[in-house]
Amino acid sequence: MFDGSNLGRNTIAMVLAGGKGERLMPLTLRRAKPSVTFGGKYKIIDFVLSNLFNSGIRRMYILTQYRAYSLNKHIRESWGKWTGLGEFCVAISPETSSDSEQWFKGTADAILQYLRFVETADADYVAVFGGDHIYKMDVTQMIQFHRMNRADLTIASLEVPKEEASRFGVFSVDDDNRVTAFTEKPKDPETIPGRETCFASMGNYIFPTRKLIEVLLEGKKHYEDLDFGKHVIPMMLEKGDRIYAYNFNDNLVPGMKSEERGYWKDVGTLDSYYEANMDLIHVSPQLNLYNYKWPILTNQGNLPPAKTVFDEEGRRGVNIDSYVTGGCITSGSTVRRSILGPMCKINSYSLVEDSILFEGVTVGRHVKIKKAIIDKGVVIPDGAEIGCNHEDDIKNGYTITESGIVVVPRKDR
């Protein structure tokens, strides 16, 4: 784990975690997108928080909003124990804080509503990061770049294909990586000269504390729905402020192989979420969760080890090319190319293939599950088939994605 530095200690983080994640429905029906499970045991929010923590940035405010209960609970139970004297990881939301009586109207408005935490932080820098992406990053390298360029704002950037760029803030830079133009989610994105790709914002920013306070108070005078991409960045460019783009591909965390750098996933749709999870079960995935020098932290819980039972012809408990977390029991069944969240039980004579099972899923006997996402606590009855016949799946009320993934939601309680 990175030991931290003065840069980390002189920085506070404001993590934006209030998004609805509508394209992930029905997984976000009862939880915010950052609270969705990833990789069996983690929450999406754990990745940005681990990056900040491992970078030595251990004063973190997580700004939550939509269906915040489960996310706030996760922050409290999983992250409170990692902090030491003078450190904190606190979730705050309009419904739980007396400081704010209204919902966030924009990304910058979310910071503005809690500006007093920035003003009293005694920090040189503020890291404003999104809470709903999957990646590893040493944030202090970005802060060093920011300092070297004496920037008023540094934007973490990556190259994306032109056909995907309309989902991002897109910008142009000069030879020194200084931003010369910026457009939020353009219909016809400007490509990098000589390429079919665009420079896109990751939604991660480094500000000097005084500059952030200044631009937010100024922006408040003009925009009620103050947003970094729509308002703050264009406003700063117009004033001639020094805005620089930090190339995320240059970032290399301790223990990371060169071929692993540059991994960043939005997981904003059910198909992209499924694909990113399935990447983990490859022999050498680009996102290496076994890099103990840069761990992804979460609430481990007091779970027993996973186990397989029965070794009879036709009733053999096996997990093949799969990612199986604590407390799971594969009982006389086959799990192949799948991810099992904590405390799943797969009963005899069943097959789970190319699927993601959330925590506490119970699969009955003689069940077939193929290319599916099963939400938390779902009980699959004996003899059921999921992903084998989409007409039947639709009749059962399941969601079918464009690529044919079947999503089984939690039952109403």
Swiss-Prot record:
The keyword DNA-binding does not apply. The keyword Metal-binding does not apply. GO terms for biological process: glycogen biosynthetic process. It catalyses: alpha-D-glucose 1-phosphate + ATP + H(+) = ADP-alpha-D-glucose + diphosphate. GO terms for molecular function: ATP binding; glucose-1-phosphate adenylyltransferase activity. Keywords: ATP-binding, Carbohydrate metabolism, Glycogen biosynthesis, Glycogen metabolism, Nucleotide-binding, Nucleotidyltransferase, Transferase. Its EC number is 2.7.7.27. PROSITE patterns: ADP_GLC_PYROPHOSPH_2 (PS00809), ADP_GLC_PYROPHOSPH_3 (PS00810). Involved in the biosynthesis of ADP-glucose, a building block required for the elongation reactions to produce glycogen. Catalyzes the reaction between ATP and alpha-D-glucose 1-phosphate (G1P) to produce pyrophosphate and ADP-Glc. Homotetramer. PANTHER family: GLUCOSE-1-PHOSPHATE ADENYLYLTRANSFERASE, GLUCOSE-1-PHOSPHATE ADENYLYLTRANSFERASE-RELATED. Belongs to the bacterial/plant glucose-1-phosphate adenylyltransferase family. This is Glucose-1-phosphate adenylyltransferase. The gene is glgC.
